From Swiss-Prot:
Cofactor: [4Fe-4S] cluster
UniProt name for this protein: ATP-dependent DNA helicase DinG
Encoding gene per record: dinG
A GO term for molecular function: ATP binding
Note on how the cofactor is bound: Binds 1 [4Fe-4S] cluster.
Length: 714
């Protein structure tokens, strides 16, 4: 479809009208360029897909929504906007689209959040009730569900009143009533515990109401995991050919796709025997109490017992073999080099893939039949069996995927990382098996790039080391296929608005020098804190261990620090904002996740402290396998893997400081390798251009601490 004069005029008119809706709106050339590039791509005028890096301040969300909505209407398609986290998803749904509705009055939009973000009305009704009969409803749903106390009951009653009175849409983030994680776990549900159409509350269930709204919406705000799952199952969203797709925070997409290719499951022989026995009893119960119209052949007790016995024998053999490979210690790990399994193990995995898939099919067959049973049955008993069968289906589905992945030599032309772990839980030894595909470009090509005609991949950070090459390798997007890669200029004057401070540290932040380095860092940080020049500060760490050691060094000012994990992130940010706005000092302290999606403008954040260059963990089985594979191809893992990842992380961390034209401040990086190593200048060149200062660090005397024990990845 060509961009007609009428369509261009519509986009221009909406953009002009938008300026009247936003106070102090500043027209920006990068924003106009992005609108034009997005429009040309979605209309099919130029290229297949577009990867466009839009730095903070460009206004990327509105830059893709305006042309996206206009073209979706013209082509009678649905615009799907996908994000990587709930915060941005909710911002688009609750802020950006309502703003656009002021200039596009008939705009229809909805959000497709994950099931776990919505309240389960069945659970809410039971927890809100003071009637024992209502609470008894939950007895068969969750054996571990703890009874609510009076305070929780009152809170749930208020939530139920808001839900029934249409004052609340059922989303956790859309209520002012405080809900801690433990209570929300009981108020929400997951796929295995959902009765779906069999539930008495199905018609008014917030989750299913939202899913039904998708069919009528012009714009659907989703997340990457849901989009990937929807493309795989052809459910939830319209057909790919009827979509316009925008992947915001698109740098996360390869990781989300990799998560779909990451399987871990317990394979302890005794545990597995218990699960198989429970499933056999469940099948027998279903046959006796809710006999299906057509009996699956495998439901025959003798056949099922023989089938399960073969599964168990294979699992027991695999346990014995894996225990020979793992060290003698109770907690141990063994990774298979290049993901290559011994022939004996590979044969077991291939056989288990077939056997567990057959059990998955049997559970699915029973579940489909149970879901069609009429009200003539005991509803509580029926629902109990449905939920138990749902759980069995989920377990065998996960097992089937695990063994299929274990049976693969390669995925997307790269090895599948495979390893086993043995660990102690509640005094008992447990064995787990893990598989992760280290490349996902084939999956993305099949589900997205080949299926959806035109896709926009955007983020404030898509490049590392000033190059799109890492994104291209991980995602499978390529110029040869007609994909375009655009990097927009930042609208900010970083030279005038900030500076980069690299203190003259005596120690590099290596594992051997960690104690001395953190002591130096704490001394400089304390000096900055005592100067009282900055009210809003952020301290970012590459590891939880380093963060905890730092906190020990500054324990006397702990009350000023708002530390990741103390409370939910949104509450920490809210408290930080209140403190600074009331004239107090406040310091947010967190890990890499705090380097993304944190938007604190002006005085709310004027100094960012970065512990060190965040290279990927060297003890990760996935990273090690990828390194082995790269070496086998005569490629240097540090150049292909570690340095681009570190560059990307550093760009995001530094990007927390300048969020608007009014922002002023400095970024402190406690890593002298930026100035002493050959790669340091390359990392600096990929950052915004700041003037650099190198102040002295206070003298610190610290005794070297014993080298910390290496932690296993689980």
């Amino acid at each position: 479809m060509a961009l007609t004069a009428a369509l261009k005029a519509q986009i221009a008119a909406w953009y002009k009208a938008l300026q009247d809706q936003i106070p102090d709106f500043i027209p920006r050339a990068p924003q106009r360029q992005m609108i034009a590039d997005v429009a040309r791509t979605l209309a099919g005028e130029e290229g297949r897909h577009l990867a466009i890096e839009a730095p903070t301040g460009v206004g990327k969300t509105l830059s893709y929504l305006i042309p996206g909505i206009a073209i979706a209407r013209e082509e009678q398609k649905t615009l799907v906007v996908s994000t990587a986290n709930v915060a941005l998803q909710d911002q688009i749904f609750s802020k950006d689209l309502p703003l656009l509705r002021k200039i596009i009055p008939d705009l229809r939009f909805t959000a497709a959040f994950g099931r776990g973000r919505y309240v389960c009305p069945r659970n809410l009704a039971a927890l809100a009730s003071s009637e024992p009969t209502q609470q008894d409803l939950l007895a068969f749903l969750d054996d571990e569900l703890t009874p609510n106390n009076q305070e929780e009951q009152k809170r749930c009653a208020r939530l139920k009143g808001d839900l029934d009175g249409y004052k609340w849409d059922g989303l956790r983030d859309h209520t002012d009533i405080a809900i801690d994680d433990d209570l929300w776990r009981r108020l929400s549900t997951d796929k295995a515990s959902c009765l779906n159409r069999n539930c008495h509350y199905y018609r008014e269930c917030p989750f299913f109401v939202a899913r039904r709204e998708i069919q009528e919406a012009e714009v659907v705000v989703a997340n990457h995991a849901l989009v990937m799952a929807a493309m795989e199952s052809e459910a939830v969203l319209p057909e790919p050919k009827h979509l316009l797709l925008v992947l915001d925070e698109g740098h996360h997409l390869p990781d989300v796709a990799r998560d779909a290719l990451e399987m871990s499951a317990e394979i302890t022989a005794s545990w597995y025997r218990l699960q198989l026995d429970l499933f056999s009893k469940l099948v027998a119960t279903s046959m006796e109490q809710f006999r299906p119209k057509t009996t699956p052949p495998l439901a025959n007790p003798e056949r099922l017992n023989a089938h399960c016995e073969e599964v168990y024998e294979l699992i027991a053999s695999l346990n014995a073999i894996l225990n020979l490979y793992m060290p003698a210690a109770q907690e141990a790990e063994h990774r298979f080099a290049m993901g290559e399994l011994p022939d004996e193990v590979m044969e077991i995995c291939q056989r288990l893939a077939k056997l567990t898939e057959t059990l998955r099919g049997l559970a699915e067959s029973f579940l489909n039949d149970l879901s069609e049973k009429t009200g003539s049955h005991d509803i509580v008993r029926l629902h109990r069996v449905i939920l138990q069968m749902n759980w069995a289906l989920g377990m065998f589905e996960a097992q089937s995927k695990l063994w299929r992945l274990a049976s693969m030599a390669q995925s997307s032309g790269a090895p599948v990382s495979k390893w086993a772990t043995r660990e102690i839980r509640e005094g008992q030894l447990h064995v787990w098996f893990h598989c992760v595909g280290i490349r996902v470009s084939d999956q993305l090509e099949r589900l997205l790039w080949r299926s959806v005609p035109h896709i926009i991949v955007t983020s404030a950070t898509l490049r590392s080391l000033n190059s799109f090459s890492r994104l291209q390798e991980m995602s499978g997007l390529k110029e040869k296929a007609g994909d375009r890669f655009v990097a927009l200029d930042s609208p900010f004057n970083h030279v005038e608005q900030g500076k980069l401070v690299i203190p003259q540290m005596r120690y590099e932040p290596t594992i051997d020098n960690e104690e001395q380095h953190i002591a130096e860092m704490a001394a400089y940080f304390r000096e900055q804190l005592e100067s009282k020049k900055h009210h809003g500060m952020l301290v970012l760490f590459a590891s939880g261990r380093a963060m905890q050691r730092f906190l020990e060094h500054v324990a006397d000012v702990r009350l000023l620090l708002l530390v990741q994990g103390d409370q939910p992130r949104y509450r920490l940010v809210e408290l930080h904002r209140k403190r600074v706005e009331s004239g107090e000092r406040s310091v947010l302290v967190g890990l890499q996740s705090f380097a993304e999606g944190l938007d604190l403008k002006g005085e709310l954040l004027t100094q960012v402290h970065i512990h060190k260059i965040a290279f990927p963990p060297i003890d990760s089985p996935v990273v090690i396998t990828e390194g082995e594979w790269l070496k086998s191809l005569n490629r240097y893992p540090f150049e292909v893997q570690s340095l681009p990842s570190a560059s990307f992380n550093l760009i995001q961390q530094v990007g927390r400081l300048i969020r608007s034209h009014a922002c002023r401040g400095e970024v402190v990086i406690y890593d002298k390798r930026l100035l002493t190593k050959n790669y340091g200048q390359r990392l600096l060149n990929a950052l915004p251009v700041f003037p650099i200062e190198q102040p002295a660090v206070p003298d610190v005397i610290v005794k070297p601490k014993a080298k910390p024990a290496r932690r296993r990845r689980r």
